[in-house]
Amino acid sequence: MELNYAFNKARSTLQALTPADRHRLASICRDIQQSEDSLNTAAAKDMHKCMAACTGICCRNIRLTEIIGFYDFVYILTVAGGMKKNIRACLKHESLFSSDCIFLKNGKGPCIFPPNARPRICITSFCFEDTPVKQQIRDVNRRFKKLSRFVLARQMKKMAASLFH
């Protein structure tokens, strides 16, 4: 299914990177984590309210492929490579239709991903007015775009090399 494909593609993409590219990708991912930390700090008061009154609405009845994809898996596997086995187990429950998030522990929560290794949408979506943290959200999104451009450039380089050799 879609997520399984994205996960396997992320794994093979990471395996194909040179040591220098892995180092650069790790640096980009650390920048994402720093942006996430800034966002969490700026949103701490509202996040505390959100978590205290959490009903899990943001993880229920969702189309998971709209929340997590290839670049999210590249990010997660880079910063939390030990999650492979857990992710693979969750992917066995992927549905074609809207369902609760398959990455919730025991199907209820909390999320299996560590706080500093979550998909972009999960990092930047809130159940409260996010105007006070718009700049921090933009920063996280900008850094995820940098990650996607980096990966795309490596894929294009690999494709060009295979065409001309």
Name what the model sees in each region.
Residues 1-165:
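Hydrophobic scaffolds flanking metal-cofactor catalytic centers in soluble metalloenzymes
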